[in-house]
Amino acid sequence: KAGCGGVFIGFESPTPEGLLELGKKFNLVKDRDFRASVRRIQRHNILVVGSFIIGLDIDEPGIGNRVAEVASQYGVDMLSVLFLTPLPGTRLWDRMKSEGRITLDAFPEDWKYYTLTFPVARYKRLSLDGVIQEMISCNRHFYSRARILRRVCSNLWQRRKPLISLVGNLSYRSNFRLYCKAYADFKCQRGNRHD
């Protein structure tokens, strides 16, 4: 009735340890069923974009595929995955700065990388190449043609904005392809500052 067509939900991490690291205890409530919550929203003809972060201190190789699998299990219509990005003035920035983990802090030049879509720090268990590869594998997994088709057909079957779902999924897929090129350029231009 309100005209809401979609919601953006920050699930943040597929693991309880990741949620604890982020202080999202709310997501750890016993018997919380995210799939049921997503379905309840979708029953009102509202699309769900799920958001996750890659680069947490507990994240290890394989986190990208884990995020894609969990997002699929939750039944989200689209997925937005971002790098853990310490922004100046936050506790995360202060902590990572004190640990010597901020790699891009030559402002104002480096502001262009603070979009949540570029790795601007050293991650504890993932190298620069590793964290970028996790992002790529996550998006490649979630936005494969077969998975997009499955989601769009599901939305068509359930009469939930299949055209918007298709356009949204193809847009994310297209952006992902652009980011693959941007990551290659980024590593060439800035990679030495991550050593």
Labelled PLM ranges:
Residues K1-M78, D94-E99:
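Conserved non-cysteine loop/helix-boundary elements of the Radical SAM core domain that shape
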Residues M78-L79, A146:
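Secondary-structure boundary/capping signal
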Residues V81-F83, Y114:
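Residue-level detector of alpha-helical hydrophobic segments embedded in or interacting with membranes
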Residues R91-D94, L104-D195:
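Radical SAM enzyme core and accessory elements
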